[in-house]
């Protein structure tokens, strides 16, 4: 498995589409999924390749002079539980720390609302993210937003 930074905007969108289309339980709203795919072209983009096949990706965006946000991530279902998400995050942590950032943050639906997102929460916590704050209405009342943060220093 190789993790590398992708810079070509078209390739970023192709990878995002190929992965997100298979993860409809998390990305079920077609308009939102398409918006993620389009916006992925403008983010710092890491991809996991099994030989030449992209099997996962992670996108980062700057949210402040010291902070990057993990704003989008996906791994093909058949590659779940194989350490690929962890490898993507570890590579992103190293690269962003080397770029001078101090913190990495991520948002997800608060624990206890949906089983699939409980799995996502456990994943982020297993990587060392710490619960920072919940915004009950950031997205909507049925999807309270949990913010996790991690120090890169």
What is each residue range found by the language model?
Residues 1-30:
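Short amphipathic alpha-helix that is part of the acyltransferase structural core
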Residues 43, 143-148:
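Short hydrophobic/aromatic beta-strand or adjacent loop that forms the aromatic wall/cage
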Residues 47, 53-61, 67-74:
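Conserved beta-strand in the GNAT
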Residues 73-81, 110-112:
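A short, internal acetyl-CoA/4′-phosphopantetheine-binding micro-motif in the GNAT/acyltransferase core
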Residues 81-94, 98:
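Conserved acetyl-CoA-binding loop-helix of GNAT-fold acetyltransferases
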Residues 96-115:
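Conserved GNAT acetyl-CoA-binding A-motif
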Residues 115-120, 134-144:
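Short glycine/proline-centered loop/turn elements that form peptide/ligand docking sites
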Residues 124, 129:
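Conserved active-site tyrosine of GNAT-family acetyltransferases
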């Amino acid at each position: 498995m190789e993790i590398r930074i992708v810079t070509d905007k078209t390739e970023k969108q192709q990878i995002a589409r190929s992965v997100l289309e298979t993860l409809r339980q998390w990305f079920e709203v077609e308009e939102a999924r398409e918006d993620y795919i389009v916006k992925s072209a403008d983010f710092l983009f890491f991809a996991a390749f099994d030989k030449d096949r992209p099997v996962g990706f992670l996108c980062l965006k700057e949210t402040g002079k010291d902070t990057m946000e993990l704003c989008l991530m996906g791994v093909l279902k058949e590659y779940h539980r194989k350490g690929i998400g962890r490898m993507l995050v570890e590579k992103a942590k190293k690269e962003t720390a080397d770029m001078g950032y101090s913190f990495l943050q991520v948002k997800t639906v608060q624990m206890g609302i949906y089983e699939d997102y409980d799995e996502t929460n456990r994943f982020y916590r297993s990587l060392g993210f710490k619960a920072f704050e919940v915004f009950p209405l950031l997205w909507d009342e049925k999807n309270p937003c949990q913010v996790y943060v991690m120090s890169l220093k």
